[in-house]
Design a protein with these regions (language model features):
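Residue-level signal for alpha-helix termini/capping positions
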Residues: 23, 46-47, 73, 99-102, ...
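Contiguous beta-strand/loop segments that form the cofactor/metal-binding neighborhood of enzyme cores
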Residues: 135, 141-177
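Short loop/edge segments at beta-strand edges and connector loops
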Residues: 16-17, 54, 81-83, 156-159
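Beta-loop-alpha module in the N-terminal Rossmann-like domain of NAD(P)-dependent dehydrogenases
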Residues: 5, 10-71
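Rossmann-fold dehydrogenase core element
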Residues: 66-84, 105-109
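Residues embedded in well-ordered beta-strands within globular domains across many folds
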Residues: 16, 30, 107-110, 156
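Histidine-centered beta-alpha loop that forms part of the nucleotide-sugar donor binding/catalytic region
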Residues: 34, 57, 83-84, 114
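Predominantly a Rossmann-like dinucleotide-binding segment in NAD(P)-dependent oxidoreductases
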Residues: 85-153
Length: 177
């Protein structure tokens, strides 16, 4: 009933109350749902033969990511983390400039992302896979890896945990250069 009213108010031509029915009517899927649903929605979409962009955090375990990437590759499907920054022309221009050496040798990169939230909220709920790492690390680490690569020699994590959720995490990647 509320879906009918919403569709009428905003001119939505098609809407579904079953995910399977939705999948029958699209060519690709953009998963931007609560963290705990990313794996299931992405897997269902791939198994229905759909290309998928999935918001961060992409998956909550490496095993889930490998499983879905392998399936997508075998079935010739596109599966990407929906990191808009990675494809932003200005960010890629910055990466090109840095790698060209025009500013000299890069010896240190610092990125920081933060968000003010008040409990209770998904970001502070361990049951909903909240926490600083799940919320912000993919974007911050993507910038460093784009600039310096994946061949870091060591890493350290420093976190402040409250109620089972990291409310602050600092990641230090050490590179051999």
């Amino acid at each position: 009933e509320s879906a009918d009213a919403f569709a009428a108010q905003f001119g939505v031509k098609a809407y579904f109350d079953k995910y399977e029915e939705f999948l029958e009517n699209v060519d690709a899927v953009y998963v931007a749902s609560p963290h705990l649903t990313h794996y299931d929605y992405t897997k269902q979409s791939l198994y229905a033969g759909k290309h998928v962009l999935c918001e961060i955090p992409f998956m909550l375990s490496a095993a889930q990511a490998y499983e879905l990437y392998d399936y997508a590759e075998i079935n010739n499907l596109v599966l990407l983390e929906a990191s808009k920054t990675a494809f932003c022309p200005s960010f890629n221009h910055l990466v090109t400039l840095v790698k060209s050496g025009v500013i000299g040798d890069v010896v240190d990169v610092k990125t920081s992302l933060s968000k003010m939230v008040s409990a209770p909220t998904r970001e502070l709920d361990v049951v909903q896979a909240g926490g600083a790492m799940n919320e912000h690390a993919p974007l911050a680490l993507m910038a460093i890896i784009k600039l310096l690569g994946k061949e870091y020699s060591d890493f350290d994590f420093h976190s402040k945990v409250e109620n089972g959720v990291d409310v602050y995490t600092k990641v230090v990647l050490n590179y051999p250069h």
